[in-house]
């Protein structure tokens, strides 16, 4: 009976070690493996007129592209309310917005907010896009499976 107990204990220990190794390996997928697992799509809300929030959103977009690979992630930044001000031609972050657009980030302005603030496309940065309603765009993206981020 004493010879059976160490064999059973040893077998149980081996099963436990194998389980831990299997789970640990699965948890340590590389970013490239995660990117190939399916589409990475992120919609970001910027509704604050705070320069810091815009810089944070642009940093998040850059970091997502750096970690996952720009070809492996689709990013859309939706600006509405007070956040729309940073998309105007005189924006303090105009050069960073241009860099993000060049790298493939989609940046859109809410036309409802533009009407409320009496802004025309000629008042805005030339390369941005437009959506009818920023909150509806965010809602629809989430319904389509996009991850939501609000910096």
Question: Where on the chain are the PLM-derived regions?
Answer:
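Bacterial N-terminal signal peptides
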Residues: 13-24
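Secreted/extracellular ectodomain signature
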Residues: 25-151
């Amino acid at each position: 009976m004493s010879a059976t107990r160490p064999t059973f204990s040893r077998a149980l220990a081996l099963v436990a070690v194998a389980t831990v190794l299997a789970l640990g390996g699965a948890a340590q997928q590389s970013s490239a493996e995660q990117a190939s697992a399916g589409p990475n799509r992120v919609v970001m809300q910027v509704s604050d007129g705070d320069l810091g929030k815009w810089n944070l959103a642009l940093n998040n977009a850059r970091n997502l592209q750096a970690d996952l690979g720009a070809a492996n992630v689709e990013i859309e930044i939706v600006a509405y309310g007070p956040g729309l001000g940073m998309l105007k031609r005189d924006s303090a972050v105009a050069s960073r917005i241009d860099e993000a657009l060049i790298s493939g980030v989609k940046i859109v302005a809410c036309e409802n907010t533009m009407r409320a603030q009496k802004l025309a496309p000629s008042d805005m940065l030339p390369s941005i896009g437009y959506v009818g309603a920023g909150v509806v765009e965010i809602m629809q993206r989430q319904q389509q499976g996009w991850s939501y981020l609000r910096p």
